[in-house]
Amino acid sequence: MKVTPLGERLLIKPLKEEKKTEGGIVLPDSAKEKPMKAEVVAVGEKVENIDVKVGDRVIFSKYAGTEIKIDDVDYIIIDANDILAKIEE
């Protein structure tokens, strides 16, 4: 299934980070904080104010966007203004 965000929105895929306590215990998803890093999957046709493209990794506002699931994969549709930074490695 292909999803194309409309207007000034982006489709992003949250990056999974395994969380461990100092003692080495792996925390379950229910105990983790909401991720704030993601990979850009699709960009709406009216996104102009930020320099991001498909494949970029970004940091976004903690509670921004609408969470959706497509083919058992979690995504977020987010407004371009909620992208805070681009991660460059």
UniProtKB/Swiss-Prot annotation:
One of its GO terms (biological process) is chaperone cofactor-dependent protein refolding. GO terms for cellular component: cytoplasm. Keywords: Chaperone, Cytoplasm. The keyword Cytoplasm applies. It is found in: Cytoplasm. It holds the Pfam family Cpn10. CDD domains: cpn10. Its main location: cytoplasm. One of its GO terms (molecular function) is protein folding chaperone. PANTHER family: 10 KDA HEAT SHOCK PROTEIN (PTHR10772), 20 KDA CHAPERONIN, CHLOROPLASTIC (PTHR10772:SF63). Together with the chaperonin GroEL, plays an essential role in assisting protein folding. The GroEL-GroES system forms a nano-cage that allows encapsulation of the non-native substrate proteins and provides a physical environment optimized to promote and accelerate protein folding. GroES binds to the apical surface of the GroEL ring, thereby capping the opening of the GroEL channel. Heptamer of 7 subunits arranged in a ring. Interacts with the chaperonin GroEL. Belongs to the GroES chaperonin family. NCBIfam families: PRK00364.2-2, PRK14533.1. HAMAP family: CH10 (MF_00580). This is Co-chaperonin GroES. It comes from Pseudothermotoga lettingae (strain ATCC BAA-301 / DSM 14385 / NBRC 107922 / TMO).
